[in-house]
A protein has these predicted regions:
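N-terminal first-folded block
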Residues: 2-36
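Glycine-rich beta-strand-turn "strand-cap" elements at beta-sheet edges
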Residues: 2, 39-46, 76-99
């Protein structure tokens, strides 16, 4: 299971535009093979920082989405709203012995 976290700092006056892009894309992302969950989180302060959190069956499923036509359409629109490059992490549960 891959837990994908993406941090996006959006232009303050474009937050509503970004939220609309996410809402229009959410169900299409969930329909992708291997996607179990996707949600948008907003920082309390400063409130122009957002995080997307998604769960993927495998890294291959995530990468297939990132290579998809849909991602190729949505990402440029999102990228145009950023104040700086997005940061992203693909993580998985660490089965450390102390857990």
């Amino acid at each position: 299971m891959i837990k994908r976290i993406v941090k996006l700092e959006i232009q303050a006056d474009k937050a509503a535009d970004f939220q609309n892009i996410f809402e229009e894309s959410k169900m299409k992302i969930l329909a992708r093979e291997g996607c179990f969950h996707v949600e948008l989180l907003r920082c309390v302060s400063p409130d122009n920082i957002f995080f997307t959190f998604s769960l993927w069956e495998t890294e291959d499923a995530l990468n297939a989405y990132r290579r998809s036509e849909m991602f190729g359409q949505v990402w440029p629109m999102t990228k145009a709203l950023l104040t700086k490059p997005a940061e992203a992490w693909s993580t998985q549960l660490d089965n450390a012995p102390w857990q």
